């Protein structure tokens, strides 16, 4: 019964959010490169279906070949998120009390709004301290997230912006670093949790990992990401600004997320093991001669 009620609520929310059919038909008939409609919000760039397809293909191939191109990853994320996936993610926020508050308040995650110096002075077990420490360790800033341009619906554009700005909190929550191996693992988690196509494409870059990295992803981090992303609560519904002084272990427990093995420590241990093995072989060769 509860499942039917939930589905009914979701249908009402989806129908309420869609524009009238007459508007859809009219805009479809008139929209072309030479007759582009006005933007729906500041910075919005309306695209035709052909333009959106071209953007998705070009940015998708480019970001697969060079995962460091954040601009291409952002463009691919927007080009593939609508008309379906970003609406589904928005509807999951609407069905959650905290998600609805986030959509109403429209908070932004920046170095100014978060007061990073204050977070550095919080107790070490808090979310805020872990987030600031992760930023410092990885050398990144919350102010580098690109503004959304290609999502047509203004509310859904905010959902995509919120997802981008929360990404570093996901890193800090699970302790994964920013280099490729860590990003692939986190993107796999995000794909299982959010369903956004861009995060799924990023998982395919696992095929570009080195042999040892691929083995770790296949044996450890891939299964961890799939299991935890699917079983945990929707991380898009976390009001991070209100959780900064929360114990990070308790937040993971509340969300149903297991912390994965320390990737940096694992890589370091493997490097030291290889170094020791190499030194041992060198000693044996020297003794033999």
UniProtKB/Swiss-Prot annotation:
It is found in: Mitochondrion inner membrane. It catalyses: a 4-hydroxy-3-methoxy-5-(all-trans-polyprenyl)benzoate + H(+) = a 2-methoxy-6-(all-trans-polyprenyl)phenol + CO2. Pfam families: Coq4 (PF05019). One of its GO terms (biological process) is ubiquinone biosynthetic process. Its EC number is 4.1.1.130. Residues 266-289 are annotated as: Disordered. It comes from the Eukaryota. It is a peripheral membrane protein. Its cofactor is Zn(2+). Residues 266-281 have a biased composition (Basic and acidic residues). Residues 1-31 form a transit peptide. Zn(2+) binds at residues 167-168, 171, 183. The keyword Membrane applies. Keywords: Lyase, Membrane, Metal-binding, Mitochondrion, Mitochondrion inner membrane, Transit peptide, Ubiquinone biosynthesis, Zinc. InterPro entries: Coq4, Coq4_euk. Belongs to the COQ4 family. Lyase that catalyzes the C1-decarboxylation of 4-hydroxy-3-methoxy-5-(all-trans-polyprenyl)benzoic acid into 2-methoxy-6-(all-trans-polyprenyl)phenol during ubiquinone biosynthesis. This is Ubiquinone biosynthesis protein coq4, mitochondrial. The lineage of its organism: Eukaryota, Fungi, Dikarya, Ascomycota, Pezizomycotina. The gene is coq4.
